[in-house]
């Protein structure tokens, strides 16, 4: 039974802050552009300027159901937590891949190895996915924070909505009919272990545990063939929380189809099977034909008997009634037409949207070619980028460094540059590669005297190792952060850097999450003129931003300055005319386009920030951030005070106690959707266990 979406709910933004800096201007521009029907725009916001708050204000003022996309689960989890705080009275939902572990089905012909699909589903995330889709069909004040998994195939929203079991007090329906209806939408009867997606029966009382809940269920009480009343109950205690006048029970799976459609689908699957068997046999592929026939007939039998089978999504083209090559239904189809998309860190996220389709297709083609799947399985896939674009009604790309794709989509760019803390983008200068190490040693000593820290980023692992060894010989307290370092050790390194155990951190990629250190006042980028992933314009701007959390922030780009530019040389004259040069000690030297653009952008932002601070009497203050020991265990001494014990200094019994404590914290972090924290804690537990 279809349900009506409530459309008169309003977004209610709850915050103790008012827009600060240039947030107000950015919010006004974005809202005005949306109300004027602008399809695409970019919010180019410097790091630390409060872009999430701006996004929240835009959602509240436009009142549109909104999809916020992020490029990984960690970032999505952080955004979800922030939006939940801003909108406690609205539906803020979370939609990411529900697999804790996922090994996709695959076939490797070279070794004749078939890898069966193996996965572990996170029940909590599955619940949140169901909550997201049901909210989208019930109301309009919805924000869904999602990873790129939202462009993967999901069942038809029409079938999902049409399958809803709608119940009201006074409604004429027999108890047995309700039980049949619940089984039809993939609910399971379980009178003992009552959990999500189950129902239980006690005489004239049916209790239903929706797939989108984890604590509350509903008790439907019958009087003959009529519903007497419906009550919400707490599952654990059975306590009645109140009566409801309407209950919409959404299916326990997103892949739904009715009985008539199921028979049609099975007929199409059988026809496709017959056609594909003829192809295989005509090509002499008898093993592939036998394999396909056996597997598909088993699935058909399961579909007939149970309405479901393992890997049912591979038949989604037939289930949905789609034509070959037609895009699958996704989360985007559950939104009303007039919805808004916000892409966070768009320079990363849009790249993922582009790459998803090709990787998925290459794997599935192998399965189809060798008789593990019917060719229609190719249509169980993520959207292509152009298909994603066809769903866009209005979109806001959010990034400190928007990518080429976003810049091609729109000329409308709204800037947000002022940090509420008054902090400025750092001063950037170029120095010669010749003598760079001795120069850098001098700069490090200056910072060490002021109890400040230094980041040094190199291009190769060998250079990082050699540089670290040289610094140690020079008496500098230094450590090297490389990709092989485990979570526990990485956390210790960052903490030790902040505490001043050492002064310099050397690495190749210092852009990873969790390496923001307010004590860092100098970032040195070696080989800044070698174009590449971490030396392109965006990579340089992001690395330069590592010094933007300190009021003394300074960045040095070391570049090849072997030859000064000569105005009389035609080639040099061309470089001078292009502007891609820098001055050093009265001479002009060539720099790369990326260096020039990164330096110009940083200087432009800094000028705007300085002017704003001067006008409003703001003095930049280095961010004060508590230094915590993530691997310390606390225990009470005789005096009742807490003391910290280092994990490496513990005995086996103490380490066991620490593991127990960390496991509890890990579960709490996962429940709070702090997936990065939970993952770090998990890795710490594994490493502590390895000590024993």
From Swiss-Prot:
This is UvrABC system protein B. The beta-hairpin motif is involved in DNA binding. ATP binds at residues 45-52. SMART domains: DEXDc, HELICc. It is found in: Cytoplasm. GO terms for cellular component: cytoplasm; excinuclease repair complex. Belongs to the UvrB family. Residues 436-631 form the Helicase C-terminal domain. Keywords: ATP-binding, Cytoplasm, DNA damage, DNA excision, DNA repair, Excision nuclease, Helicase, Hydrolase, Nucleotide-binding, SOS response. GO terms for molecular function: ATP binding; ATP hydrolysis activity; DNA binding; excinuclease ABC activity; helicase activity. Residues 32-187 form the Helicase ATP-binding domain. Forms a heterotetramer with UvrA during the search for lesions. Interacts with UvrC in an incision complex. It comes from Lactococcus lactis subsp. cremoris (strain SK11). A motif (Beta-hairpin) lies at residues 98-121.
């Amino acid at each position: 039974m279809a349900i009506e979406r409530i459309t008169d709910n309003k977004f209610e933004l709850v915050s103790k802050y008012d827009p600060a800096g240039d947030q107000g201007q950015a919010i006004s521009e974005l809202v005005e552009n949306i109300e004027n029907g602008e399809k695409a725009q970019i919010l180019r916001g410097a790091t630390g300027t409060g872009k999430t708050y701006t996004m929240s204000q835009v959602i509240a003022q436009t009142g549109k159901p909104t999809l916020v996309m992020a490029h990984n689960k960690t970032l999505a989890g952080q955004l979800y937590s922030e939006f939940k705080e801003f909108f406690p009275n609205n539906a803020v939902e979370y939609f990411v891949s529900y697999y804790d572990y996922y090994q996709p089905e695959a076939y490797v012909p070279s070794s004749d190895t078939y890898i069966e699909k193996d996965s572990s589903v996170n029940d909590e995330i599955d619940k949140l996915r169901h909550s997201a889709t049901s909210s989208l069909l019930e109301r309009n004040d919805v924000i869904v924070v999602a990873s790129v998994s939202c462009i993967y195939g999901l069942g038809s929203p029409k079938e999902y909505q049409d399958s809803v079991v709608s119940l009201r007090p006074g409604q004429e329906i027999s108890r047995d009919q309700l039980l049949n209806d619940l089984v039809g939408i993939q609910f399971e009867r379980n009178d003992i272990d009552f959990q999500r997606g189950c129902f239980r029966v006690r005489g004239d009382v049916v209790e239903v545990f929706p797939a989108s809940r984890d604590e509350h269920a509903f008790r439907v009480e019958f009087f003959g063939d009529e519903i007497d009343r419906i009550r919400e109950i707490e599952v654990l205690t059975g306590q009645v929380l109140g009566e409801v006048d309407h209950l919409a029970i959404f299916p326990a799976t997103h892949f739904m189809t009715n009985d008539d459609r199921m028979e049609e689908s099975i007929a199409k699957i059988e026809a496709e099977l017959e056609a594909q068997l003829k192809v295989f046999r005509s090509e002499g592929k008898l093993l592939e034909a036998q394999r396909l026939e056996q597997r598909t007939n088993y699935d058909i039998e399961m579909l007939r008997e149970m309405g479901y089978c393992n890997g049912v999504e591979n038949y989604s083209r037939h289930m949905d009634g789609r034509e070959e090559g037609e895009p699958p239904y996704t989360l985007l189809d559950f939104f009303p037409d007039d919805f808004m998309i916000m892409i966070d860190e768009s320079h990363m996220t849009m790249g993922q949207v582009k790459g998803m389709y090709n990787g998925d297709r290459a794997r599935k083609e192998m399965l189809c070619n060798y008789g593990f799947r019917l060719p229609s399985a190719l249509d169980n896939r993520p959207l292509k980028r152009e298909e994603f674009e066809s769903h866009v009604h209005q979109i806001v790309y959010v990034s400190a460094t928007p990518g080429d794709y976003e810049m091609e989509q729109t000329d409308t760019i709204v800037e947000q540059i002022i940090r509420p803390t008054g902090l400025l983008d750092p001063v950037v200068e170029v120095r010669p590669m010749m003598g760079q190490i001795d120069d850098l040693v001098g700069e490090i000593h200056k910072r060490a005297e002021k109890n400040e820290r230094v980041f040094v980023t190199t291009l190769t692992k060998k250079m990082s190792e050699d540089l670290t060894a040289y610094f140690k010989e020079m008496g500098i307290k230094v450590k090297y952060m490389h990709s092989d370092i485990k979570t526990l050790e990485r956390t210790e390194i960052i903490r030790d850097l902040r505490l001043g155990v050492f002064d310099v951190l050397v690495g190749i990629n210092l852009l990873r999450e969790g390496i923001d250190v307010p004590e860092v006042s100098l970032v040195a980028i070696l080989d800044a003129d070698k174009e590449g992933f971490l030396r392109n314009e965006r990579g340089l701007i992001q690395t330069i931003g590592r010094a933007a959390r300190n009021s003394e922030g300074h960045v040095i780009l070391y570049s090849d300055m072997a030859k000064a530019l000569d105005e009389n040389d035609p080639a040099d004259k061309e470089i001078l005319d292009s502007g891609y040069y820098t001055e050093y000690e009265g001479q002009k030297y060539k720099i790369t386009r990326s260096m020039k653009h990164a330096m110009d952008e940083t200087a432009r932002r800094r000028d705007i920030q300085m002017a704003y601070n001067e006008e409003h009497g703001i003095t930049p203050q280095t961010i004060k951030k508590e230094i915590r020991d993530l691997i310390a265990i606390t225990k009470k001494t005789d005096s009742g005070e807490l003391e910290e014990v280092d994990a490496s200094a513990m005995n086996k019994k103490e380490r066991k106690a620490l593991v127990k404590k960390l496991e509890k914290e890990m579960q709490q972090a996962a429940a709070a959707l702090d997936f990065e924290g939970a993952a770090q804690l998990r890795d710490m537990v594994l490493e502590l266990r390895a000590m024993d």
